[in-house]
Amino acid sequence: MQPNVETFIGCDSSYRAASIVLYGAPYDSTTSYRPGARFGPAAIRHESYGLETYSPYQNADLTDFDVFDSGDLELCFGSSESALADIEARAEEVLKDGKFPLLLGGEHLVTLGAVRAAVKKYPDLHIVNFDAHADLRDDYLGARLSHACVLRRCHELVGDGHIHQFCIRSGDRAEFEFAAQHTEMHKFDFTGLAELTAQLCESKVPVYLTIDLDCLDPSCFPGTGTPEAGGVSFLQLLDAIRTVTSANIVGADLNELAPTLDTTGVSTATACKVLRELLIALDKGWPGFQV
């Protein structure tokens, strides 16, 4: 792996020394409303240099840890299956090397490629999802590989009771009916996350964390393809990240920043800060991981 010309701030470790490997999937070909998430990874890297590596929230510095930024994958925008296969291959390589794969999207469909790799190594995988949308449609306009269907496709891999969703405030009736039978859905906020995390810690099951940034309220994060009013605050998301990363997290992703949809740059700055805090929270917990 070769580093990108411009890496995320503080992610300057070599691949050999790294415990976490950051890789980008600039893909948004199934976006159903406003495109632009393909530009998210590059924008986050570029704007990160306006951010300190030190986190006053966690009293830790990114430079205290070993993170390697491998840059973006070259993905075929005309083929979702091809793009997912490339994402899966990179995640599988990182997992095989005993490292933690952290995927930077892109639209939420990219999660499926990473989960495919994770479930090969961890058949008992659980998924924790922070999102405004249920993403449980069986198809969207006839397409089964869509960001509106990503958690439904993940459910086909991990089964009932293994998907735990938070902040959900949008979806059609069929999605909510499906969730009532097959997933654990917490609407609107992070109520129940502490209790779930305690259960996951006690059972020591492997957990994949997927964060769709549209879980945030659009008043602080308007730069996303499908904004939904009524979301959580940055501090609520940070608290949730610090809570859930005490579980046995074995892979993660951060997705759905569409930087061109917020010309103020606030959304990109927020995404940078979320990524910094996520990296630190994950790396602080690394000795407890069962990779």
What are these regions (language model features)?
Residues 1-291:
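Conserved alpha-helical scaffold segments that buttress catalytic/binding sites
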